[in-house]
Amino acid sequence: NNGVGVASPGFRCRFLPVKSCLDASTTSIDNGYDGVYYAADHGCDVINCSWGRGGGPSQFEQDVINFAVLDHDAVMVAAAGNTSSEEADYPPAYTNVVSVAATSSNDAKAGFSTYDFSVDVCAPGNQIYATVYNDTYTSYSGTSMASPIAAGGVGLIRSRFPSMNALQAAEQLRITCDNIYNTPTSNSAYRDKLGKGRINLYKAVTDTTSPGVVVENLTTSDYNDNVFIAGDTLRFQALFHNLLRPTTNLTCTLTTSSTNITILPATFNPGAVNSGDTISNFSLPFRAIINAGTPL
């Protein structure tokens, strides 16, 4: 510690800056996915993307992310966006990306931060002191500041648990978050749209017991024409994959806050699930009824 400037959460992690814009660009990321490919191909364990766009998904972009995460074992971390609204931006909303929203110092959602069901975690992003050009420092606000804090946390996790692969390290970051929905802030309006909560790096590097069960390949069907209308009974089937430590008494329950849906009693109790195992509820799918009068 030389007492100058700032320090990264990713203490002693090496970093590789990747240029992803043209010389003439001032605010545009022109070749972001080329940069992701380059970073993965050059052995980066964590790739931070403090950039993104609105609109729909692209299979090409998802393929580049899968190349980085699944083929080259790099954790992809991306800023959720600064729209102050509920929306899915890209790359943060892609599969296999850790989407990071921003919080303020009291754990409330930062006013500028995008929120969405696709968000995975939050990190501080309001008035973050950082380096800038010409050997100076300044404070910035944005999910672009929150994302590298989360990425640095992943660097710590991968240093602490070197046997973890990319998906496991990302899940370790997620499951060790602090719950910020029940704190004395205004986050209740964003329930489940700020991910698991605000990252806690101490827990992330000390928790050696928690499992990490994720839902994969969720499908919804009415066992008819799959045109959902009031009165239909929907069936939800999924795979449940345990990325981390074994469970002893796993219980999966379907819930909703919507008054237009009635959940039928259906709790899936797989019990013990070993690390790396995948199970399904195909034989006992979750069920829910779309109530009469529901606008569709």
Predicted segments, located by residue:
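Intrinsically disordered, low-complexity Pro/Gly/Ser/Thr-rich segments with frequent PxxP/GP/PP motifs
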Residues: T262-T294
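Short acidic, flexible loop segments centered on an aromatic residue
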Residues: H241-F268
